[in-house]
């Protein structure tokens, strides 16, 4: 199963980018042995529109253009479900076992995701009630993808 992360905003050089790349590489290495490919990262520049509704709409159009019809769409949203790591791993493993071609994880911009994208999502995940910068959300998502792979493989990284 191909894993893709679509994120509004670009990670600049620095510790967040290095940490994100570390977890991306770890998932890629372990994930291949488990039937996963990726994660591919698609960065979309933030809209420069003057008002939030227009920014959200422009960003949603750019995101939607990257989502194939039969992909499982997962949004990262503060209103989403709070899953523990084992539950997240079960979801990811379940989609793989159902021969899902792609799982697309979407991280919105500062104004959030459009209601249409949120409605289309098979799952919406929250990393808690706090608002997180998109750079941190990307690192946390990539770490959880790697952690899910370790759980699915029986690797001792996850100690619960």
From Swiss-Prot:
Keyword Transport part of the UniProt annotation: no
EC supergroup of this enzyme: transferase
Keyword annotations of the record: Cytoplasm, Methyltransferase, rRNA processing, S-adenosyl-L-methionine, Transferase
This protein's GO CC annotations: cytoplasm
Record's subcellular location: Cytoplasm
GO function terms (MF aspect): rRNA (pseudouridine-N3-)-methyltransferase activity
EC number: 2.1.1.177
Substrates-to-products reaction catalysed: pseudouridine(1915) in 23S rRNA + S-adenosyl-L-methionine = N(3)-methylpseudouridine(1915) in 23S rRNA + S-adenosyl-L-homocysteine + H(+)
TM ranges: none
Pfam families xrefs: SPOUT_MTase
CDD domains recorded: RlmH-like (cd18081)
Binding positions (S-adenosyl-L-methionine): 76, 108
Protein purpose: Specifically methylates the pseudouridine at position 1915 (m3Psi1915) in 23S rRNA.
HAMAP family registered for this protein in UniProt: 23SrRNA_methyltr_H
Subunit details: Homodimer.
Family to which this protein belongs: Belongs to the RNA methyltransferase RlmH family.
Listed name of the protein: Ribosomal RNA large subunit methyltransferase H
């Amino acid at each position: 199963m191909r894993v893709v992360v679509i994120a509004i905003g670009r990670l600049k050089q620095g510790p967040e980018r290095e940490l994100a790349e570390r977890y991306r590489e770890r998932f890629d290495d372990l994930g291949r042995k488990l039937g996963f490919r990726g994660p591919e990262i698609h960065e979309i520049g933030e809209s420069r529109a003057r008002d939030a509704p227009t920014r959200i709409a422009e960003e949603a159009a750019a995101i939607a253009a990257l989502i194939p019809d039969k992909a499982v769409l997962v949004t990262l949203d503060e209103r989403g479900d709070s899953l523990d790591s084992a539950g997240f791993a079960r979801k990811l493993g379940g989609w793989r076992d159902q021969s899902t071609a792609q799982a697309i994880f979407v991280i919105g911009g500062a104004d959030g995701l459009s209601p249409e994208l949120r409605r289309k999502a098979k799952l919406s995940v929250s990393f808690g009630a706090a608002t997180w910068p998109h750079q941190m959300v990307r690192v946390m998502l990539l770490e959880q993808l790697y952690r899910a792979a370790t759980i699915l493989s029986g690797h001792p990284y996850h100690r619960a």
